[in-house]
Amino acid sequence: YALTETGSWRYEIIEDIIENNSKLLNDFRVKNYMIHGLSDKYSEISYMITEELKKQTKEIVPLLKDDFDPQGKREMIYRLDIISSLCKEEENDFYKYCIENGSKEIKEIAIGALKYSQDNIDYILDLTKTEKGKLKNKAFEVLSYMSDDRAVKEWDKFFKKKPFENI
């Protein structure tokens, strides 16, 4: 009931289950409830569940992608964070889908996930030109993970424009 009901008493129960009954968390049905718990109104519970789901295997990814809404709020941000943590570059197409269709918050997480594949250099370079503000800064951050001379050149241009604002 701790994953489906409301009330502050649930935090300790969920925490106890995570710390002491890890075998219970391997039950496929419980994983569905945990994913549902990502939308919990208590952010501490959502965060705790997110961190636990990041320790699971990739078999939960289809559950996380089921009914995924790139325009969604906190629950979808947690889902995307878990997917990128588990799958790294394997879900590269999904990250691009989220960038093209997502809310600003979803886009930011998805842009961050592009760092896992060196093949994303052209896509990231495009983002540094098309995105603005926080998303542009995130694209430049991810560009720092790329081992390509073009990334270095783009960073040089970035700092030459407004050196103190870009630090």
Predicted features, each with a name:
Residues 5, 9-25, 36, 45-56, ...:
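Structural detector for internal amphipathic alpha-helices that build alpha-solenoid repeat scaffolds
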